[in-house]
């Protein structure tokens, strides 16, 4: 082993040992190690079978559900559970890996779309999974085709890897890559072809650029699409969700390829994440019983429908970061059969996306149909989100606003509702979790 690699390992692991005692250390150890040896990740990852999960929405939950299943097979699975998904976080993940008791080293990693190509200079995945691509952080990623091309550039570096795609997205039709491709998607009862419910990305037919119609439209531009001009249609699915048995604000049950599964996480959008996890697990050889066992042990992860108690109140923290994701979160809380207070926390740091105009494309109008006695607008851009919420027609006198997340927490405590939902952008979610962790209301995790 080269001296620079040895020094990198020493610096990275020593810093992780110290920082982990403080509930920190998911990126700095990797950053220190890379300063000594820029190729250290290649050395650390060389003996692993690697599954990469990327895409706009659903990376963290898809990864967590997959890891839960694969632990039933392998016992030990390397992953980055706190969502540190750039090269420093991925390097830290490998730096701190424990030896597998089975002798088989498996890593399931969520990786940032813009970082993936650079990271693939050092790792060689056997499977890439793309959950979806929607408009997100335009100041960082650009428009959706730019993001998609970033991902395809990474995949082309590993032409032997299989690529698992969301077949319900027209964007993923016939990708320009040499890799073998498989598709997952919803294959429930179809109806007459209609325009999408809402298509904020403006996706057109990938062959002739005509407007697409849908025989089944799950949400946004996803579903069984067809072009009536040229006949282009969704590809055949390798992994099919054929029935939605139950859908609530905190759980769902569904049938995939003849087997019924359930997760203790609400919302239609999260069923796509479960479907992707089933597809990954089956590709890697897991049977339905092991998949069920993994799902039975699953829980909401790191700000993705994470629940906690404040006194006698049951609270749920939900990450939002773009129009489609926010709209789906709103659809999910709409399923709650009880009144609840709502807090919406909007920051505009680099990790959130500095441009917050996306809030005007999210369907906040639905809140006027819910039993929400009070709303709290918080975060750096509290006045912006408060204005957006007032525009829905929700009574302005029932909206409080503050930049202080500590004050938001105190307000939730004082409100009468026994249930609360907190929708938060990424850095607001991290800050709010820190407040909760300091009160020991949630488990402190590295961030």
State where each predicted segment sits.
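ATP-dependent carboxylate-amine ligase
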Residues: 1-15, 19, 24-26, 202, ...
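Short glycine-/acidic-enriched loop or helix-start segments at secondary-structure transitions
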Residues: 62-63, 118-119, 139-140, 173-176, ...
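Buried hydrophobic packing segments
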Residues: 66, 70, 90-94, 274-284, ...
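Residues at the starts of beta-strands that form the adenosine-phosphate
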Residues: 76, 126-127, 161-162, 180, ...
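Residue-level signal for inorganic ion chemistry
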Residues: 110, 131, 164, 273, ...
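Adenine nucleotide phosphate-binding catalytic loops in nucleotide-utilizing enzymes
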Residues: 185-323
């Amino acid at each position: 082993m080269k001296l620079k690699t040895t020094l990198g390992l020493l610096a990275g692991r020593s810093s992780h040992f110290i920082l982990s005692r403080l509930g920190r250390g998911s990126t700095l150890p990797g950053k220190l190690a890379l300063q000594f040896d820029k190729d250290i990740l290649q050395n650390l990852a060389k003996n692993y079978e690697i599954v990469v999960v990327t895409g706009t929405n659903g990376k963290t939950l898809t990864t967590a559900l997959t890891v839960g299943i694969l632990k039933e097979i392998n016992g030990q699975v390397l992953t980055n559970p706190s969502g540190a998904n750039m090269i420093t976080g991925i390097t830290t993940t490998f730096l701190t890996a424990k030896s597998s008791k089975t002798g088989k080293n498996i890593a399931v990693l969520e990786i940032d779309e813009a970082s993936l190509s650079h990271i693939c200079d050092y790792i060689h995945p056997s499977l890439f999974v793309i959950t979806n691509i929607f408009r997100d952080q335009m100041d960082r990623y650009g428009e959706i085709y730019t993001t998609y091309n970033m991902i395809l550039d990474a995949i082309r570096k590993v032409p032997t890897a299989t690529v698992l795609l969301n077949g319900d997205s027209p964007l993923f039709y016939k990708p320009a890559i040499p890799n073998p491709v498989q598709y997952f998607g919803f294959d429930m009862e179809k109806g007459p072809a209609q325009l999408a419910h809402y298509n904020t990305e403006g996706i057109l037919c990938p062959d002739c650029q005509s407007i697409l119609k849908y025989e089944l439209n799950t949400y946004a531009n996803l579903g069984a699409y067809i072009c009536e001009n040229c006949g282009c249609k969704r590809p055949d699915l390798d992994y099919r969700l054929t029935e939605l048995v139950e859908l609530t604000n905190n759980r769902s049950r569904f049938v995939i390829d003849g087997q019924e599964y359930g997760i203790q996480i609400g919302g239609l959008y999260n069923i796509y994440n479960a479907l992707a996890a089933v597809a990954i697990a089956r590709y890697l050889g897991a049977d339905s019983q092991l998949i069920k066992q993994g799902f039975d042990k699953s829980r909401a992860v790191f700000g993705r429908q994470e629940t906690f108690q404040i006194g006698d109140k049951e609270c749920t923290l939900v990450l939002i970061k773009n129009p489609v994701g926010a709209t789906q979160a709103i659809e999910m809380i709409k399923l709650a059969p009880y009144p609840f207070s709502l807090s919406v926390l909007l920051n505009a740091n680099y990790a959130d996306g500095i441009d917050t105009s996306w809030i005007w494309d999210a369907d906040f109008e639905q809140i006027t149909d819910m039993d929400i006695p009070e709303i709290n607008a918080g975060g750096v851009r509290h006045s912006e989100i408060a204005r957006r919420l007032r525009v829905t027609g929700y009574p302005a006198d029932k909206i409080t606003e503050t930049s202080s997340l500590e004050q938001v927490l105190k307000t939730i405590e004082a409100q009468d509702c026994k249930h609360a939902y907190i929708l938060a952008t990424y850095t607001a979610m991290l800050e709010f979790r820190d407040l909760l962790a300091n009160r020991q209301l949630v488990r402190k995790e590295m961030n």
